[in-house]
Every structure is written in structure tokens, then in C-alpha cells.
Design a protein with these regions (language model features):
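A hydrophobic alpha-helical transmembrane-helix feature that marks the membrane cores
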Residues: 1-234
């Protein structure tokens, strides 16, 4: 009994440290993305190079997708330092490709949408953490919704339908609201089931993987909301 009473505070400390690490790395990724996006959008030569050459833009997108798949699928096979570097690199590259939002939307609408997104994200994350309901069953439904969004977005690249784009955005908000709660509960389960004597590098890699999931939820939720509430510069 004495050992249990000693280990419980220790376990709670490990959970808190792990969750704090996840959200810290997520925040670092978001800040880096924002800084890079602002810098690129303010550099006319860079914007012409990136958005004036479709090949370069496509290569950047492919590189980003490759980094996401590498971190998600091979994180256990790489060192903690490599996983951290790839996450930071992905955040920076994402800032490059997302710099277009500062060219397409007014800064006022970007800022206001960010706060709406942040509030929504926090609320969904809190729900995912405190709810007693098992959200595992939502995973398959949400992944089907995500695949549907990707396919519909690719199709709409050819049709360029504003109405279809708006429908995709509303569905996207629903999907990423659900994914935020779902991924937060997964994060909670990961934090509470990690061994007390877990290796530091293993914990770091888990934190990077969790940060990537929440980062993607936040970024995509923000982009969907921006399509709905953003005010065009035109």
C-alpha cells in the first residue's frame, strides 16, 4: 500500500509532464509556422518563386506529406532528436506553403479567425480529456470524413465551385472538431499508460507524435474556418 501511495503522485507527475511537453511542442510548431508564413508573405521574391512556379509548390506539398508520413509511421525507429528535427522542419515548410493566407485574406479576419479557432480547439480538447465516453468508435467515421474532404477538394480544384468549397469547409470544421477531441483522448490514454520507468527518448518521441496530431487538427480547423469567415483582400 505504501508503494502505491508513493507511485501515484509520481505517475501523475509523469502524465502532467508528458501532456505539457505535447502542448509545448505543438505551440512551438504553430509559432514557427506563423513566423515563417509572415516572413515569406512579406518577401515578394520568395512569393513569386513559390507561388509563381507550380512545380516548386507541388514539391513543397509532397515534402510536407512525406514528413508527416515519416513521423507518423517511423517515429519508433528514429531517434528523439531526428523526430524533433523533422517536426520542426515540417512546421517551417508548412509556414512556407501557408504564407498565401496573408496574401489572400485581410489580417483582421486572419486574427479573428485564429481566436475563434483557438477557442474551439481548447473547448474540444478539454471535452476529449474529461469525457467518460469512449471516442474510439468515432475514429473510423472521422477518417472516412477526412478522406471524403480530400477527394472532394481535389475534384473541386478542377470545377472551382465556391458553393462546393463552402460545403467542404463546413464539413471540414465538423471533422476536425471531432478529431481534436478524439486525438486528445488518445493522448490522454497514451500519457496514462506509459511506464513509470519509460526511457526519456521514447517519451519525447511520443510527445512529438502527439504534438503533430494536435498541430494538424489545429491548422486544418483554422483553414476551414478561414474559408468560412475570412475576408478576401480583393
Amino acid at each position: 500500500m505504501a508503494q502505491t501511495s508513493v507511485s501515484r503522485p509520481r505517475a501523475e507527475t509523469l502524465v502532467n509532464d508528458f501532456v505539457r511537453s505535447v502542448y509545448n511542442w505543438m505551440a512551438i510548431g504553430l509559432c514557427l509556422t506563423a513566423v515563417v508564413a509572415l516572413y515569406v508573405s512579406g518577401n515578394e521574391a520568395l512569393t513569386r518563386l513559390i507561388f509563381g512556379n507550380s512545380l516548386i509548390f507541388i514539391l513543397l506539398i509532397v515534402a510536407e506529406l512525406g514528413l508527416v508520413f515519416a513521423i507518423s509511421g517511423m517515429v519508433q525507429k528514429m531517434s528523439a532528436g531526428t523526430a524533433t528535427f523533422l517536426f520542426v522542419l515540417y512546421s517551417a515548410l508548412n509556414g512556407v506553403t501557408l504564407s498565401f493566407i496573408f496574401l489572400a485574406y485581410t489580417q483582421t479576419s486572419i486574427v479573428s479567425t485564429f481566436f475563434v479557432c483557438a477557442g474551439t480547439f481548447v473547448g474540444c480538447s478539454i471535452y476529449g480529456w474529461i469525457t467518460k465516453r469512449d471516442l474510439t468508435s468515432m475514429g473510423g467515421f472521422l477518417m472516412m470524413g477526412l478522406i471524403g474532404i480530400i477527394i472532394a477538394s481535389l475534384v473541386n480544384m478542377f470545377f472551382r465551385s465556391p458553393g462546393m468549397s463552402m460545403v467542404i469547409s463546413y464539413i471540414g470544421v465538423i471533422v476536425f472538431v471531432g478529431l481534436t477531441a478524439y486525438d486528445t483522448q488518445k493522448l490522454k490514454n497514451m500519457a496514462m499508460t506509459q511506464p513509470v520507468d519509460a526511457d526519456g527518448s521514447v517519451v519525447r518521441k511520443g510527445a512529438i507524435l502527439g504534438a503533430l496530431s494536435l498541430y494538424l487538427d489545429f491548422i486544418n480547423l483554422f483553414l476551414m474556418l478561414l474559408r468560412i469567415f475570412g475576408q478576401s483582400r480583393d
